Regions:
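Gly/Ser/Thr/Pro-enriched helix-cap/hinge segments flanking short amphipathic alpha-helices
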Residues: 42-45, 49-52, 60, 70, ...
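Repeat-based blade/solenoid architectures
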Residues: 62-83, 120, 150-162, 201-212, ...
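Beta-propeller blade signature
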Residues: 122-130, 258-265, 316, 373, ...
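Hydrophobic beta-strand segments that make up the repeating blades of beta-propeller
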Residues: 95-101, 169-178, 224-228, 303-307, ...
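Blade-edge beta-strand/turn elements of extracellular beta-propeller
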Residues: 53-56, 137-151, 192-202, 269-281, ...
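Short, conserved, GDST-rich strand-edge loop motifs in beta-rich repeat architectures
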Residues: 100-119, 228-255, 417-435
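Beta-propeller blade termini
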Residues: 81-91, 128-129, 158-168, 172, ...
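Asp-box/WD-like beta-propeller blade repeats and closely related beta-sheet repeat scaffolds
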Residues: 147-163, 177-216, 226-253, 257-259, ...
Length: 591
């Protein structure tokens, strides 16, 4: 496909505008959503500096507490979830939030048997984001629980989800992964959803974790991948013990790992299970995380799966409907010592600015998290020590992770959600009833191939010790600063509003599809590359929009590539979202 160029003749307006304004540039319809400063006072660190993030969960009306159903039997699933998602379910231009919820694990158990009873009714929750202008301070977030109207009921013991428009009707649909039967929910477009699992042929009763919608065959519709974990039966719950001989949670090595699933979208509302013929089902693994991307530079979307305690999988897309596991050859199956690790969550980004995507994986305490630098041609190298990311991670068990440029300086940073999986004796001896809590972490990319931990200046929420699992990212208040949602096990949600990016320039692109590659050329000739994606992290869905931090620069050129098609915009305005039209010359679209 040819390349199409378009020049912007638009001047950025310094005034705050809420909503969208239609314009035309070379016949291409775009909308500009101008930046607005988030309302509210700035939280400060102990040194008096403005904290990088502020917890705004309560003031924004985002009240949710996870229930894991624990009754003292140490059932393995109860400490593994939850994830959740950030996506625009109603198409109004802002991000809504979806929460996965637990339940009692054994039939016949009652809520009064739970060690941590819950006051709210059980079930997944959907919160609608009603942004409102609060002049002159900017835009305020206000969330409304619309779960009942949405129709979600009996959604199982929740783990994670995937969000994507599988039928091309313009509305985002959901695939919910569970300990137990997974569910496919179609978005009707009127604020409600319907369970169409049987009709789509995507049911799976095994223990699934992370999932993703991805167009593996480049036919314009979204296919579906689900990572499966291990075989666990509550009726055959094995007993495991801590070093003190006290009861403790078992690890995945006590169980048989599963194979993953891949379904091809037929384009008629149904899916074909191609797990076996694609090659995906050839290898077992205790899958916890999955991320899609072109990891060998051949233009096709591949799948990388983080396995817990076993070699990871890098499924390279051959382009003929089959995949080959290239993890061992590529250097991403094991760590630098040749050992498998307890891989949980994962992130991909061009962390070193050399034009290709590197990989970062979270692991169990005492293993260290792992940074795989992309050497090109499908080869990777473990650079965890050299990036200074290994040592600070040793005390923690990490799950969700996000490559987020939290200060908009153009370098992708790392936010990490932590929480133990074995009883912490230091907490247990103090009488802690759920001694798995750990603080989360924030790392700033120095731009020289290394990172520095900046957790101490990240804000009060990063000083808390909780059992964090899922982590999702997105610009919730349209200020160009990407925010965080942290999903805690047996605890409250944390909405962490980004305050660190204020004053830095940025360029946002909305209307992107998962897999789109974005390139921005700055005025100093620096090239910034990003990939639109919703997957990665752990059991979570993030915003598909792309925000590119520019620091103090402006943009000379914006290029978007999709399935070999390419469009280029000259002199794009900054500090705005450019909303791509549904049909752009040069870019393939969904039917």
């Amino acid at each position: 496909m040819g390349e199409h160029r378009h020049r912007f003749g638009l001047r950025r307006q310094p005034t705050v505008v809420v909503g969208a304004r239609a314009t035309r540039a070379a016949g291409i319809a775009l909308a500009l959503i101008l930046a607005a400063t988030a309302a509210g006072l700035s939280a400060e660190t102990e040194t008096g500096e403005r904290a990088a993030f502020r917890d705004r969960s309560v003031e924004a009306g985002l009240r949710f507490r996870h229930f894991n159903g624990m009754v003292g039997a140490f059932y393995f699933p109860e400490m593994t979830g939850p994830g959740g998602g950030l996506f625009d379910f109603d198409g109004d231009g802002d991000l809504d939030v979806f929460f996965r919820q637990g339940r009692l694990l054994v039939s016949g158990e009652t809520l009064d048997q739970a060690l941590f009873p819950i006051e709210d009714s059980l079930g997944d929750r959907l919160f609608r984001n009603d942004l409102s202008q609060v002049a002159p301070d900017g835009i305020a977030m206000s969330f409304v629980d619309v779960s009942a109207a949405a129709g979600f009921h009996d959604t199982g013991y929740g783990m994670g989800l995937a969000a994507g428009d599988y039928d091309g009707d313009g509305d985002l649909d959901l695939y919910l992964t569970n300990y137990g039967a997974n569910q496919f929910w179609r978005n009707r477009g009127d604020g409600s959803f319907e369970n169409i699992t049987a009709a789509t042929g995507t049911g799976d009763s095994r223990w699934s974790t992370s999932a993703t919608f991805v167009d593996i065959d480049q036919d314009g519709d979204l296919d579906l991948f689900a990572a499966n974990y291990v075989r666990f039966d509550v009726e055959k719950n094995p007993r495991c013990f801590a070093s003190t001989s006290a009861p403790d949670y078992c690890g995945p090595s006590a169980f048989t790992s599963e194979t993953d699933r891949l379904w091809r979208n037929r384009g008629d509302g149904t899916f074909e299970d191609i797990s076996v013929k694609s090659g995906i089902a050839r290898a077992r693994g205790a899958g916890l995380g999955v991320i899609s991307g072109d990891f060998n530079g051949d233009g096709r979307l591949d799948l990388y799966v983080a396995n817990d305690g076993e070699a990871n999988h890098l499924w390279l897309n051959r382009g003929d409907g089959t995949f080959s596991d290239d993890a061992l050859f590529s250097g991403t199956a094991l760590n630098r010592h040749g050992s498998p690790e307890a891989s949980m969550g994962l992130a991909a980004a061009d962390f070193d600015g050399d034009g290709d995507e590197d990989l970062f994986l979270t692991h169990l305490a005492e293993e260290s998290n792992t940074f795989y630098r992309n050497l090109g041609d499908g080869l990777f190298e473990d650079r965890s020590r050299e990036t200074l990311l290994a040592a600070p991670s040793m005390p923690y068990t990490s799950f969700g992770v996000a490559a987020i440029d939290f200060d908009n300086d153009g370098w992708p940073d790392l936010a990490i959600a932590n929480g133990a999986v074995r009883i912490r004796l230091d907490l247990a001896v103090k009488g802690d009833r759920y001694p798995l809590e750990q603080p989360n972490q924030l790392f700033r990319n120095r731009g020289d191939g290394s990172f520095e931990e900046v957790t101490s200046s990240a804000g009060a929420a990063f000083a808390l010790s909780e059992v964090s699992r899922g982590l999702a990212t997105g610009d919730l208040d349209h200020d160009g600063a990407v925010d965080l949602i942290i999903f805690n096990n047996n605890g409250p949600v944390r909405l962490l509003a980004n305050q660190a990016a204020r004053g830095k320039r940025w360029l946002g692109i909305a209307g992107t599809q998962a897999g789109d590659r974005v390139r921005v050329l700055t005025e100093s000739a620096r090239t910034l590359r990003r990939t639109a994606r919703t997957d990665g992290s752990y059991c979570s869905v993030s915003d598909v929009r792309v925000v590119v931090g520019l620091g103090d620069e402006t943009a000379r050129e914006l290029e978007i590539e999709r399935h070999g098609g390419r469009v280029r915009f000259l002199d794009p305005p900054v500090d705005v979202y450019l909303v791509l039209a549904a049909s752009l010359p040069g870019l393939p679209t969904q039917p």
